[in-house]
Amino acid sequence: MRYAIFAAFLLLGACATAPAQAQAQCPPAGFSRAELDALRAAEWALHDDARRNALALALVRGCLDNPDPGLRDVILFEALSHWLRGQQLTNQTMLAIADNLEPRLAAPEGEGFERPFAALVLSEVARADRIAPYMTDARRRRLLDASIAYFTTVRD
């Protein structure tokens, strides 16, 4: 019986720590803050398409709700805006970003960064679709519905 209880506690402990290990980090793995600052100084020139697309998604996953405005506002938003406006992200990456951000519009308020920055970045994703359509009509409608639902809950 003691072993069963001990095993149960170990299992619960493992479950409790699993999300922390699965959480995305900011700065993303493989990039230091200094490297991201250097990338910004180089006007976001990242010539490896796969690495650029992976970084864009990693920034969204890890930095969107970061309380550091230098990471969230400057690194995340400026990089994504630059790459989206320059049509430097694949359709697959843009859809993955939208898929990551859309549920965040309905997330609990937290520190107050996640929901508004999800909306801000989604506006850039939607703009990219307006310039060069890549979403299906159904996907575009889903994004519109989620955005409207978010905006009706905003109290300032």
Regions from the PLM with identified roles:
Residues E102, A106-D156:
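Eukaryote-skewed repeat-based solenoidal scaffolds used as protein-protein interaction platforms
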Residues Q23-A56:
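Extreme N-terminal leader/anchor segments
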Residues G70-G86, P116-A128:
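Non-membrane alpha-helical segments in proteins
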Residues R52-L59, L71, A79, L89, ...:
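Structural recognition of alpha-solenoid helical scaffolds
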Residues T17-Q23:
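Sec/Tat signal peptide C-region and signal peptidase I cleavage site
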Residues P67-P69, G110-E111:
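Short inter-helical turns and helix N-cap capping residues of alpha-solenoid HEAT/ARM repeat scaffolds
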Residues I5-A14:
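Bacterial N-terminal signal peptides
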Residues W44-A50, W83-M94, A126-R140:
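Flexible loop/turn segments at the boundaries of HEAT repeats in alpha-solenoid HEAT proteins
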